[in-house]
Amino acid sequence: ASDVYKRQLVFTLEVLMVDLSMASLLPILISCVTATCFSYILMGEKSLFDFTLTDPWELDRVPACILLGVFCGFVSLYFMRTMSACEGFFAKLKQYPYVKLLFGGIILSSLIFLFPSLYGEGYSAVNILLKGRTEADWDMVMSNSLFYGHSQLLVLYIGLVTFTKVFATSATNGSGGCGGTFAPSLFIGGFAGFFFARIWNIYKLGVYIPEQNFTLMGMAGVMTGVMHAPLTGIFLIAELTGGYLLFIPLMIVCICSLLTISIFESHSIYALRLAREGKLLTHHIDKAALTLMGMQSVVEKDYHPVSPDLPMGKLVSEISRSNNNFLPVVNQAGVLLGIIDITRI
């Protein structure tokens, strides 16, 4: 991931690492440096997204940034819940691999036919949103779709693409492909941010907000919500686009997005499945110890149950046979009635 995005140390520490030690930090540093060097050699130093700040951030746009953060939080919730539901659907088809492949292929091909922007990782479409200004640019976003040539339907197209991208990703992952979650969260965030800004400006809900800037902030907001990683969202988006002058609005959007998603989901998309299975290791030492502990290894099974009407002589015999300090008293149905503490006899 460092090879592609050139900013993955923060992601590793914030999302993947449960505990940090020098022994675990050194391999991470070495792998990040190596991957980044090869990336510069093979692809150059150009940013993944082409962004130029032409409209600096202003203080009167704070309310819009807060609302965008809340909106990104709900988009992140939709992303996570829909992905989880689709994974469950495809998991039921595990015994029928060809049926699963057929379902995934039909869903994905149908969505790409209707919305060509869904093809691939979609970075080219996001780049158009980041630097587009004219109707010709918006037509490029809708190129080869049924919406092409109808720039007045741009908002509808952007909204539908945002809505359906999750299904395209889920169909890819579920049918055996590699759709990932990192790149789709960037794509959905960019389109969601542009959709929010365009609706805001059309209905004049407040001061004018630059759509390109909010496309960028939407990427950070959705990534933060999906991964529960605000530092990753802030630094990664700033690094990918060179938009360091938008640090304050990026912070506002990421914080609001995280606060919103945390109300509904306490774990990131990477930790959600482990948490549901009870296998998630956390920074809480006691919880981590309980997670790693095998209950079968601590449950005592070597005991000799006795009946409540057992004569005293036989009870003494049972006590001599027992390797524990207690004898469970059970009835004929095997229901526990009490415990005899040998140390108190």
Language model: regions and residue ranges:
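Short, small-residue-biased leader/transition segments that mark boundaries at the very start
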Residues: A1-Y5
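Juxtamembrane interface elements at the cytosolic ends of transmembrane helices
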Residues: K6-V10, K46-S47, V70-F90, Y119-Y123
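Re-entrant/interfacial helical elements at transmembrane boundaries that shape
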Residues: Q8-V15, F49-D50, Y123-I128, N173-G193, ...
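Hydrophobic core segments of alpha-helical transmembrane domains in multi-pass membrane transport
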Residues: S31-F38, C65-F74, L101-L114, T162-T169, ...
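Helix-loop-helix hairpins and the membrane-proximal interhelical loops
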Residues: A85-P210
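Membrane-interfacial segments at transmembrane helix termini in multi-pass membrane proteins
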Residues: N213-F214, A220-M227, L231-P305
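The conserved cystathionine-beta-synthase
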Residues: V306-N323, V329-V330
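Short beta->alpha transition motifs characteristic of CBS
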Residues: L336-I345
